[in-house]
Amino acid sequence: EVVVVGYGVQKKKLVTGSTIEVKGDDIQKMNTTQVLGALQSQTPGVNIQAASGQPGDGFKISIRGAGTNSSTAPLYVIDGVSGGDINALNPADIERIDVLKDAASCAIYGSAAANGVILVTTKQGKMGKVQVTYDANVGWQNMYKKPQLLTAKQYMAVQDQVSYNNGGSAYDWSKYIDADLLNAYQDGSNAGTDWIDAIRNKNAIVTNHSLNVTGGNDLSKFSMGVGYQYQDGVLGNVVKSDFRRFTFRLNSEHVVYRVGKRDVIKIGENVYYQHKQNQGVQIGNQYSNVLSDMLRANPCVPIYNKDGNYFMYDDLKNSGSAGWFAFNSYTSNPIASMVNNQSGANKGKSFNLNAVGYTEISPIEGLTYRGQIAYKQWSNSWRCYLAEYRLNDQGASRDKDQLSNNVGLGWNWTLTNTLNYKFNIAKLHHFDTLVGMEYYKSRPDYGESVNATVNGSIFKDFAHAYPSLADGNAVASVVTGEPAGYESKLSYFARVNYDFDEKYMLTAIIRADGSSNFSPDHRWGYFPSVSAGWVISNEKFMESTASWLDFLKLRAGWGQNGNCNLPSSQWRAGFEFGEYGVYPFNDKTSNTTGAYPNRLSNPLLAWETSEQLNIGIDTRFLHGRLGFTADWYSKKTKDLLISIQANAVSGFSTQWVNGGTVENK
C-alpha cells in the first residue's frame, strides 16, 4: 500500500512522518456537500468546524492547533497543484485524501506548509471496459438541539425582578398584553413566541447527484465526473437560505512512447470546473447575526399584529414608557429586521476553473522527469437589495432603498518541474531521490474587482438591483475598484528517501522559497527537515510475535516550515490617490488630486518560521483488524507576522512586523 507524499508516492510502511489517509469511499459514505465536512471525525489531530452553518459555507480547520497569528488553514494540494480550493470539490470526485501533520512531512512544501498539508487526489482513469456509475442520495436535516429560551411567563418574572432590584414594582402587564393572552402566558398554556422555531426550516432537504465514467487500456485511461449538490438551510423558513453547485471533472493519461514495460513518454491533464450559487440569512459576528437576534427577542410579543403586518415595538409607546422598556424596544422585531436587511434579498455566484497539463519522460529505468503547468481562473459576484422600511423610531429604519453589486475575477499560474531517480545498491539499500523547482505568478493585470453601492432605485425589487437602474434622485453612490494583488514565488527543493531492507528508514528534505512579499535582503527562506524510522516487526527477534502482531514501527522527525501570509509588498512604502491627497500647488482657490503615502515600510520583514519535533509509533494487530497510532509533538512558531499599532507620530495606524512566539504541544 502506498500513500501520497509531496511530489510523489511512497510505501506506507516506509513513511517516517506523521500522516493520515482517508479513502474516497469513506468520504462519499458521509453524504455531505462539502469535502471537509466529510473529514470530520476521520482525521485525528485535525480540528474542523463549520465557519457559519450557512449552506455551502466553508470550514475553519487547524492541524495540531493554531500556530500562527494569521489564518490556520493548511495548504491544499489538489492533484499535485498547490493552493487549490477544497470547498469547490464534489466529495464524489475524491479518490483519496492524505494529511501531512508534522514538519518532517511538510517541509517539501516549505513556506506554504506551516499549518500542515492536505493532499487531495481526484478519481483517475482505470484500465478496463468503460464503466458508468450514477450515485444519488436525498436526505433531510433538522436542528439537533434547539436552545432553551425563556417562556413568556419566565420572561415577565425576570423583568419584574429587574424592576424590584431597581427600587420599582412589578409591571402591570395587562396594559401591554391582551387579557386572554396574558392569562394563557401566566398559567403556562401558552409559552409565548418561540423566535428560533419561527425561522427553523423543518426537514431541510439535502441532495447529491454524481455521474462518473471511467475506462481505458494499457496506453490510455480517462475518468470523467459530473455532479450536482443542493442544500437547504435549517434556519431558512422565513428567508430562503440555500446552496447549489454544479461540478465537472475530466482526468486522462496517455502513453505516447513505450519501450518494453517502461513508459518513456506520458502526457495527461486534470480539469476541474465548479459553478456555485448561494443565498442566505445574514451571518455577521457572534454579537450581530440573525440567530443572536432571535435569542434576545421578547417571547411576550407576537411576530405579527392583528392586521397581519409585522409587530413593531412602537405600537406599545402610547401604553406607558415603563412597560415599553420591558419589551426591549431598542431591539426591533428580529424577523421583520431579517426580511428587510441583507438576509431578505441577496445572491452570490462563483465560477472556478482549474486546469493542469503534464508530461512525464523516463529516458532510463528509474529516472523520471515531470513537467507540469497549472492554470487557475475564478470569478465571483454578489448582489443585495435592501428595501425601504421602518420598524421603530430607534433607528430600525431605512428611508431609501439600497442596492449593492460586487464583481471580481482573476487568474494565476504555477509551473513545476521535478526529476525523480530511484535506484538500489546491493539489493538491500534502496534510494528514492527528488529534485525540483516551482514558480508561481499572480499580477495586477491578471484580475480585478469592482464594487458599487447606490441608495435609490427605479424598480424597488431584487430582480432589478443593479447600479445602472438607480433612480434620478439616487444619493451616496459609491463605486470602487482595484486590481488583483501582485505576488510571485520561486522555489527549489530536494528530497532523499533511504531504507535498508525496509527496516531502517531515513528521509532528508530541503526547500528554498523566495517571495516578493519580502525585501531583497530577506526574500529567501530555507526550510530543512530530517526524519527516521525503524520497522521493529521486520527484525528476526520479533518472529515469535508474528501470529498476533502484524506491524510495529517507531519514527521520529524534526523540521522547519515557513509562512509569508500577509498583504503583498508590506516591506515597502505604498501610495494612494484620493481625498487625502489634494494639493493647492500654485492655485490657492482649488485643489488638485495627487498621491499620498498610505502605509509604513518595513524592509526588515522576514519569514515566519515554524519548527516541529515529532515522535510516533504505528502498529497493526490481528491480521489488520486492529490498528493503533500515537504521536508526541512539540511545535514552536517564531517571528510571527503581525500588524501592530504604529507610533502615533508616524501618521499611520498600523505596521507589519515580525514579533511573538507560539508553542503547541
Q: What does each model-found stretch correspond to?
A:
Residues D85, N305-G308, N380:
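A contiguous, mid-domain pocket- or channel-lining segment that forms the substrate-recognition surface
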Residues L291, R390-N392, T507:
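Core alpha/beta catalytic barrel or barrel-like domain that forms the active/cofactor pocket
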Residues P55, Q282-Y287, E388-Y389, M542-L549:
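Short, glycine/acidic-rich hinge or "gate" loops at secondary-structure transitions
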